[in-house]
Amino acid sequence: IGVVVDDSDAERDGPWNQSTRRPNHFGRHYLANAKGKGSHSITWKAALPKPGVYEVRASFCGGENLASNARYVIRHAKGETRILVDQSAKPTIDGLWFPLGRFNFEENAEGFLADKGDNNWVIADAIQFTPVNDLNKKAPLESPNLEDASTAIFRGAYTPFYYGFDGFKAPVRGHYQFRVKARS
């Protein structure tokens, strides 16, 4: 769905390590950099089929020893939005994609990631731009969709997280609303 730009088609600044060590990745491999200081980066550029609102998703493997504060930047029609993502959390869409937000784009879209992290590996795999027409249209632009939650489901970003009450770990910094609904 939409346009996918893999790491092999992205622009790199500085050396990155190609890897297939972790199983969940898009394409033949992903790129990784350890304990970066922000001097290396990767930029995904996409020519979109038409202007409009797109959901931007990042692919990363998730797991131990990955950055808890990967710094993504999405450049869109209204400027740019910076997003911190906990890459140690499992991606929420098919175990491969993590939604970064919905943004209005002209015909060109750009995603950026620097290797500055918290002494752990930063993963750069693929970025997906999916037209909102192909998805649920409820989410507002440039902000997480905090839809009504169902029974014991925590919502953050756009996809429900099925974590227990004792171990909830939000993969993106921000404000969350929790609602509990009792059923008999």
Where are these regions (language model features)?
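Substrate-binding/catalytic groove segments of enzymes
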Residues: 65-66, 80-82
